[in-house]
């Protein structure tokens, strides 16, 4: 996997966003939406009027690093 962005020390920003939402018990839209890339679920926001992009993530995103997700959640819960 190639990591495109670094957010708060986490190379993979999709993993960081999923972990952050789960660690903070945030309500997440489209969590089961089958997306193939980062922009797929951004385009699907049109179906949810008024929903911010940051509230929309997908566990199907190809950039999601499942192996580091648990570690990221634990670290974010300690913040």
Predicted regions and their residues:
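Generic structural signal for hydrophobic core residues of well-folded globular domains
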Residues: 22-26, 35, 48, 73-76
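Compact alpha-helical subdomains of small soluble proteins
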Residues: 4, 40-79
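An amphipathic alpha-helix signature
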Residues: 15, 19, 35-46
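Short, exposed beta-strand "edge-strand" segments with a Pro/Gly-rich flavor and a Y/T-containing core
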Residues: 19, 33-35, 58-64
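N-terminal acidic leader/helix
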Residues: 2-33
């Amino acid at each position: 996997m190639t990591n495109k962005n670094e957010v708060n020390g986490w190379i993979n920003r999709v993993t960081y966003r999923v972990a952050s939402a789960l660690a903070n018990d945030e309500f997440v839209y489209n969590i089961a939406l089958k997306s193939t890339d980062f922009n797929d679920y951004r385009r699907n926001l049109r179906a949810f009027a008024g929903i911010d992009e940051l509230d929309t993530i997908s566990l199907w995103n190809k950039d999601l690093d499942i192996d580091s997700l648990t570690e990221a959640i634990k670290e974010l819960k300690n913040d």
